[in-house]
Amino acid sequence: MDRLHIIGAGLAGSEAAWQAAQAGVPVVLHEMRPRVGTFAHRSGDFAEMVCSNSFRSDDDERNAVGLLHWEMRAAGGLIMATADRHALPAGGALAVDREAFSGAVTAALRAHPLISVAEEEITELPAEGHWIIATGPLTSGALAESIRAVTGAESLAFFDAIAPIVHAETTDIRCLRQSRYDKGETEEERTAYINCPMTRDQYEAFIDALLAAEKTEFHAGETAGYFDGCLPIEVMAERGRETLRHGPMKPVGLTNAHDPATKAYAVVQLRRDNALGTLYNIVGFQTKMKYGAQTAVFKMIPGLEQASFARLGGIHRNTFLNSPTLLDDQMRLRARPNLRFAGQVTGVEGYVESAAMGLLAGRMAAAGILGRSLPPPGPETAMGALVNHITGGAVAKTFQPMNVNFGLFPPLDDARGGRRGRKDRYKGYTDRAKEVFTAWLAAQA
């Protein structure tokens, strides 16, 4: 039987190896640590949690990441089973003892009879064989260059230029829908943007808050240089109080239907971020403000006072593919179908999301080697919604890493509005997802 080779023993690679081996496929897991280290990792253990010890909410009834936990447990995931065994008290969240967790994952993989570990750095994309690349945001320079050569110069990013993403349903009716200069051939195109106009006083107060907000510093190993194309908004504001008004907040080409005679002093634009139209990103608002400061400052924008954020902004090093243009729904590189990608390098963000994509990639690769066909789970599920987002549901031109959230799910037919309705709707999402995911697993039995 052919072997499956996996590059990277992070959360995605570890889960992919486990799933494939459990399906009966021999696996070679290639990991460069501890021989070649990174500035972030502290050990040679697998599935090392670098940034925090939290897998976030464990509520599988009304939280999208909790639902993802449920799906991974249902699928026999190694990462979730190990996390449960090494869980710490954390309220409604799932947090783990990091060292015990990664040590246990390492022990389980090394003990599996179908998994062999090769402690070596892979510097080029292999031309033959079955491979999963799960090298994460700190992909080594040599391999990153090989990926860039195969996928194209614009396909691999080395810094996130992350703008905040808002749940569209939480924007206020005062916000107006219009493309700048009414550009577009269809009504949908001409109303593609949500616009939030500001008076001069509102703009000045916003700039004051932006300049005073607490910012994060670059981590060790990150360059402090910025690309002009993705300057943080606070850096732009530091260059002059009017800079933003002549940049992403310029008020030209837009009219206020509520008050046509009054011109806005500045305008914040939100652009659709997914095909469903449930998520919008704040255009040009990449930032390194701390999360608490972001929420306070961005809620000063007229119409966003009650906004719910699917993701807050940030700029930090992250190697990821423009997956919607490169990967098929089997997570294979279209140009080289023997190569699958999994984890954070595909453009998902978060420990759980990365491991979930590893779970899918491992199962899909094993099915292919065994001569079977395995479609992804439906987009009604958390895993299916994520893989759909990274392989076609997202807008390729503005693609950025994404956490799982209900904005990625197809809407429910009988959803109600309001706070109480939102809780019922989330429960509706999870009930539907569990039914669809259970059927997907049963079809593989």
From Swiss-Prot:
Keyword Flavoprotein: yes
Enzyme class, first EC level, given as a word: transferase
InterPro entries: FAD/NAD-bd_sf, MnmG-rel, MnmG-rel_CS, MnmG_N, TrmFO
Pfam families: GIDA (PF01134)
Reactions performed catalytically: uridine(54) in tRNA + (6R)-5,10-methylene-5,6,7,8-tetrahydrofolate + NADH + H(+) = 5-methyluridine(54) in tRNA + (6S)-5,6,7,8-tetrahydrofolate + NAD(+); uridine(54) in tRNA + (6R)-5,10-methylene-5,6,7,8-tetrahydrofolate + NADPH + H(+) = 5-methyluridine(54) in tRNA + (6S)-5,6,7,8-tetrahydrofolate + NADP(+)
Entry keyword set: Cytoplasm, FAD, Flavoprotein, Methyltransferase, NAD, NADP, Transferase, tRNA processing
EC number(s) stated in the UniProt entry for this protein: 2.1.1.74
A GO biological process held by the record: tRNA methylation
GO cellular component, one term: cytosol
Cofactor(s) this protein requires: FAD
Chain's role: Catalyzes the folate-dependent formation of 5-methyl-uridine at position 54 (M-5-U54) in all tRNAs.
HAMAP family, per the entry: TrmFO
Record protein name field: Methylenetetrahydrofolate--tRNA-(uracil-5-)-methyltransferase TrmFO
Species: Rhodobacter capsulatus (strain ATCC BAA-309 / NBRC 16581 / SB1003)
